[in-house]
């Protein structure tokens, strides 16, 4: 989830070990505070995910010169630590009072993974860390 940006001009790209991938970016929605929000995701087969390759989501917003990225990779068992996004504070101002608002990256709080063999894994995410339920 990428939220809190204005104007509605955010670019999202996905990479697997620095090679461009075809991710999905949904149409932006305007929020009550007049900023925008969108969702992007990359579908990765389990056999590829478990090889340990690094997947990166890169977000840029020309209106605010915001650039950030989140990298992740499979880690067997235990805890998966996610980095805190770049430290830029999101702007939640109405469009009339600022020229550009910073987007912020929001982590999914619960993650359900369906394996190709029909099995399922559930993760509970809190404070930038995910643990298997």
From Swiss-Prot:
Q: What is its main location?
A: secreted
Q: Which CDD domains match?
A: IgC1
Specify whether Secreted is a keyword of the entry: yes
Per UniProt, subcellular location reads as: Secreted
Where would I find glycosylation on this chain? 32, 112
Any one annotated GO CC term: extracellular region
Q: Which InterPro entries does this UniProt record tie to the protein?
A: Ig-like_dom, Ig-like_dom_sf, Ig-like_fold, Ig/MHC_CS, Ig_C1-set, Immune_Resp_Modulators
Keywords assigned by UniProt, alphabetized: Adaptive immunity, Glycoprotein, Immunity, Immunoglobulin, Secreted
Q: Which GO terms describe its biological process?
A: adaptive immune response
Tissues of expression: Expressed mainly in lymphoid tissues including spleen, epigonal organ and circulating lymphocytes.
Q: Where is the Ig-like domain?
A: 1-71
Secretory tail: region residues:
76-133
Cited PANTHER family: TAPASIN (PTHR23411)
Indicate what this protein is called per its UniProt record. IgW chain C region, secreted form 2
Which organism is this entry from? Heterodontus francisci
């Amino acid at each position: 989830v990428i939220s809190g940006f204005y104007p509605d001009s955010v670019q999202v790209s996905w990479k697997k070990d620095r090679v461009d991938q075809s991710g999905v970016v949904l149409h932006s929605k305007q929020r009550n505070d007049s900023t925008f929000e969108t969702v992007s995701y990359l579908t990765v087969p389990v056999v590829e995910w478990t090889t340990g390759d690094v997947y990166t989501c890169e977000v840029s917003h020309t209106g605010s010169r915001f650039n950030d990225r989140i990298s992740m990779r499979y880690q067997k068992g235990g805890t998966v630590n996610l980095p805190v996004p770049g430290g830029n504070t999101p702007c939640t101002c109405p469009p009339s009072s600022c020229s550009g608002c910073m987007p912020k990256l929001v982590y999914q709080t619960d993650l359900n993974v369906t394996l190709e063999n029909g099995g399922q894994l559930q993760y509970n995410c809190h404070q930038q860390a995910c643990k298997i339920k």
